[in-house]
A protein has these predicted regions:
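Non-transmembrane alpha-helical segments in soluble domains
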Residues: 25, 277-281, 330
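Concave beta-strand-loop units of leucine-rich repeat
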Residues: 50-59, 69-99, 105-118, 127-140, ...
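Linear, non-domain "peripheral" regions
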Residues: 187, 193-257
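Secondary-structure boundary elements
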Residues: 244-314
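Solvent-exposed loop/turn segments at secondary-structure junctions
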Residues: 282-287, 321-322, 346-350
Length: 366
């Protein structure tokens, strides 16, 4: 004679850390469900299908993988982080990111302005339809993009130190339902699989990018559009310079010509930098006219889209301000396979432009 036992998994109490428990209890209250404490049944946790986290100090998302019905997760931090010591920044960390990678039911994931993560692994999040990774200034690597085949929205830009995404062209081609594509300007060569040795590219990827009417963006002075916290399809608070694909093709082609004319093919990195600096010094003037315009992005060369702080205005129009020079230089360096990133640009009423230099973890005006 054998005994049968009832499966009590639904009644089992799952204890979560206080930070995560508080987030969940707040979300439950918004849904009209009263719950207190850090212990949850599976039935209660399964009520949480979406979560928006405005990161605070002491954040701890360990255990978030217990939200087995979680479909939409947005993690953001509203404060500008450039130039701040890490102790003055709130951000999720690598352990939190690993916990998020265990949320297998996610269809929408946004990671915005998190300074303590260096790697994001989405290889296990195969249900994703919408992915936004933006303004994470110390993010170096995104793993597993090639495992995603159901993406409808892909937004990756403003990640200042992100390594090249070698399979980005395949990601674009393999996601047949892709509808929204918003990427960093520096990712264009990766998106078309540009070969710096012979100048060839993936023409099929380029055709799809053009068909999607992709957006190509450059972040300005550490700002990020808070409207994108609400939805990645809304960018009314435009704190970046934006180009369409036709403009990117023009920018790319002229940049390739500049490299051909000013940088010897087989030279080292130092000679490449000198050649690029020589071109910018001789051919890009300061956009004095745009300085009096009220819009942060507007260029006297090409209005809103050109962006006085953008590489397009510098390379195509020969005029720029502030980050327009560095954005142009970054793109030219990218074509030579040289990695670079912007540092903080600080502006005030008495000093229009002040260089900020990090020394021994402190930020000192130079």
């Amino acid at each position: 004679m054998s005994l049968k036992t009832k499966d009590n998994n639904e009644d089992r109490i799952i204890i979560l850390n206080n930070y995560l428990a508080s987030l969940i209890n707040t979300r439950l209250a918004e849904m009209g469900i009263v719950h207190n404490g850090a212990g949850f049944t599976r039935d209660i946790l399964n009520q949480i299908t979406d979560l928006k986290i405005d990161v605070k100090y002491g954040v701890n998302l360990s255990g978030i993988e217990n939200l087995e019905m979680l479909n939409r997760l947005t993690i953001y931090y509203r404060r500008r982080t450039e130039g701040l010591l890490k102790r003055n920044i709130a951000s999720i960390n690598e352990d939190d990111m690993k916990a998020i990678s265990g949320c297998k039911s996610l269809t929408d994931l946004s990671i915005i302005n998190q300074s303590f993560i260096e790697e994001i692994d989405v290889s296990g999040l195969t249900q994703l339809k919408s992915l936004q990774i933006s303004f994470n200034q110390y993010l170096y690597k995104i793993k597993g993009l090639e495992r995603l085949e159901g993406l409808e929205d892909l937004v990756i830009y403003g990640n200042n130190r992100l390594y090249p995404l070698k399979n980005l062209n395949e990601v674009i081609l393999n996601n047949e339902s892709l509808d929204l594509l918003r990427l960093d300007v520096l990712m264009f060569p990766d998106a078309i699989k540009y070969d710096k040795e012979n100048g060839n590219c993936d023409i099929n990827s380029l055709k799809k990018i053009a068909k999607l009417n992709a957006e190509w963006c450059e972040q300005i002075n550490g700002w990020f559009p808070t409207s994108e916290i609400e939805t990645i399809r809304m960018s009314k608070d435009q704190s970046y310079v934006k180009y369409n694909t036709a403009q990117m093709i023009n920018l790319h082609n002229k940049s390739c010509q500049i490299i051909h004319d000013y940088v010897p093919k087989d030279c080292g990195a130092m000679d490449a930098v000198i050649g690029i600096e020589q071109y910018l010094a001789q051919n890009v003037k300061y956009d004095k006219k745009a300085k009096v315009l009220s819009s942060l992005q507007k260029s006297s060369f090409n209005g809103q889209i050109g962006g006085k702080n953008g590489s397009y205005s510098a390379i195509m129009g020969g005029i720029a301000q502030c980050e327009g020079y560095t954005h142009a230089m970054q793109y030219l360096l990218k074509l030579k396979g040289i990695r670079s990133h912007n540092v903080l640009c600080y502006v005030n009423n008495t000093n229009p432009i002040v260089q900020i230099v990090p020394i021994n973890k402190a930020i000192i005006p130079k």
